[in-house]
């Protein structure tokens, strides 16, 4: 059973990578901030970050990468539907102000984030989750047939590994 799970996981990863190669224009892979900072970005004029939990400091450990700190000064820095995923605490406000004042355009997903950023003098707008940018026909063009499961299952989506949550999900599935 363990081998079957490994094979299924490899198959899913291959399909995901094929999707990225077919539909997303990717740069080479970077593994740390210094690699990004030392790159020559001569042909790039806009840097964009955003979406799911990208500015949740608890998940990203306040990593500079998510605030585009590596981008050259003469480029445009922007976010699209950047998500904090939680309420912005008073202690986090100075950090966000220092990082986001460098951005040219900011959009966030949560209304609460928009309001908190306005309170600290950061202009931004609220945008929808990017998953809603495509219509049904566009999504169907990219979809594949998935065989129907032979038995009921529970789908678990975790932002970070959690043995406690996995135990709850396994208990629920019984």
What residue spans do the PLM features occupy?
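Aromatic- and Gly/Pro-rich donor/ligand-binding loops
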Residues: 1-98
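Hydrophobic/aromatic ligand-binding patch that stacks against planar heteroaromatic rings
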Residues: 69, 116, 172
């Amino acid at each position: 059973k363990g081998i079957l799970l490994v094979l299924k996981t490899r198959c899913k990863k291959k399909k995901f990578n094929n999707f990225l190669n077919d539909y997303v224009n990717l740069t080479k892979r970077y593994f740390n901030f210094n690699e990004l900072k030392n790159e020559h970005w001569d042909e790039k004029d806009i840097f964009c970050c955003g979406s799911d939990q990208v500015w949740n400091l608890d998940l990203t450990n306040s990593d500079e990468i998510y605030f585009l700190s590596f981008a050259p000064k003469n480029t445009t820095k922007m976010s699209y539907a950047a998500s904090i995923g939680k309420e912005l605490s008073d202690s986090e406000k100075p950090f966000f102000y220092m990082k986001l004042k460098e951005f040219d355009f900011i959009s966030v997903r949560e209304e609460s984030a928009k309001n908190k950023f306005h309170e600290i003098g950061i202009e931004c707008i609220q945008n929808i989750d990017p998953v809603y940018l495509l219509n049904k026909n566009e999504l169907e063009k990219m979809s594949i047939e998935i065989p129907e499961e032979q038995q009921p299952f529970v789908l678990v989506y975790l932002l970070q590994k959690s043995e406690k949550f996995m135990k709850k999900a396994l208990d629920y599935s019984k």
